[in-house]
Amino acid sequence: MSVFSSFNLNQCMKQTFLEEKMCLKLLNSIPLINYDEHTRRYSFNPMFDGFILQVLDEMPVDEVTKITLRAADTNLDDGNYFEAMKLYSHSKEYRKIYQHNIDFIDIYPYVIKQNKDVFTDIANHYWDIEKEGHYEFSLIICFSLLMFNEKHMVETLLTDITSDICKDSVLSDNKKNSYMAEIQFIKAFTEYNDFGKMREGFNIILSISKSPVNIIAGGFPFNYECPSIMMLYHRQSGALDKELETLEQCAPDYYRITNGHGKGFEALMRADVLYNRGDLDGAEILCQKAIYMADSRNQYAIYIAAYYILANIALYRGFNDQYKENMHKIEAVARRDTRKSKSLEKLSDICYACMYSDIEQQDKIAAWIKDQKKIEDSVNFFSLSFVNIVFGKYLILNREYHHFLGISGQLLGLNNLFSYILPQIYTYIYLAIANKETGETIKAHKFLKEAIKLAEPDRIYMPFVHNYSSISELMAETVIGHDNQGFIRNVIKISKGYEKGVKSIKKAGHALADYGLTVREADVAKLASQRFSNKEIAEQLFIAESTVKSNMKVIFNKLQINSRAELKNFFE
């Protein structure tokens, strides 16, 4: 069983050929085997790993290979596809994985840096396997490599896959056309993130097949683990309106060829643009439109990103109840889609981290977002620049200026790789702050000018507004051309309202803490004070009714009250 990273009882029975009773007896008798009651899965204690490796080293190679392949087959049958991929790769056996029907939706969460070697190894053995009419997994591997930015290898694979499909006598003409449409979809994504060129690629699909592509599309969130469509597709300073127009023009055809993948992305992009320009009312309207569109196709990542902008708007206005409600919805939606839960949970963590950094509660940020190596090992390559913005803000808030300065070159390089403008603006702002705080005033002015130079042509104010308290003196000191004065005046104007909103939200949070209640307990208490039943509270907060009951007991104890009626005194 040691070849499994974790396993359930059924897998144990298959792998060992033992009956349930004997498996349980053995599992329960070994202290170094851990059991997770929530997932009902077993795993070996890390202390046991060294011993296990020694045992395996002393066994005949053929026997170890046989055990590993049996475990791979078990994982494949049980739908644990990435676990199967790892074991097949380790055993140098690739036929079954290439010929199996696997959904990309089950593979996408594992397309992260720490797993790159597995994907690359399997891709390198494409040429060794007879496909026998099965090319789904080959295309999945192709798109996965594209997400590792391995464009050269992807182009080589696509050329040979195209040739093999054309020569495959097993396939009907209709099936060949279907595969060709899928190949064209991947080719379009080789032009990421130039949506103009991507659009040209998508339009070719309409002439190849009348059916929607379905092997890749729908298997990954349109916005990956990034809550900002604008971050992904704004790539040229001064061209934001043109880029937005291109997305809006392409959306109907993209939805047609993908059966609604990313539905609502063009409304969300415009909402993002308007928010960054300080047009909160316009952004709010378009967020509601994006939510409606995304909900019609279960596009949860778009849904979450829309609520993220709404949470930012509520923060600006100082509307604490709306702010908390939008944040709760982000968390609830992330739990809704269980098959994609890993990527959606990451997206939720990233949204929360952004909001916590805005109200200077950086200690509440998820642990993995505070660790640069874990970020690089956990986040899709296309989303990495956005998470680096959050990590950079975390370092600035904690006054780790030298740490940020040390990694800034790497961050700028990654931003340039995809021509990401928004992360570049934030990085320059953080560089200005870090240099100012370390006594390098001339450099600070230089980097602030660079940030303004990128942002001013498209009227992107919010990165400066979010950091205004740290850069206000620099902005006043920096010598900027006459053309930029209007831009700076708008930043100052928007910042006044933003700082009031942040103070209001922070004050509300402190008031709850003064009662001795956690945020969750305060939410429950407030609804209870309004005479909502436990069931109604559970539905509104997306928690179990039993959780509400246990919270109410704690609330009564902390506030030293005996009835719900007394709660009104605390929330008037």
What are the residue ranges of the model-derived segments?
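Internal alpha-solenoid helical repeat scaffolds
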Residues: I129-A305
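Linker/hinge segments immediately adjacent to helix-turn-helix/homeobox DNA-binding domains
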Residues: V390-L397, H402-I421, Y430-I433, E437-V519, ...
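Helix-turn-helix DNA-binding segment
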Residues: K503-K553, N557-E572
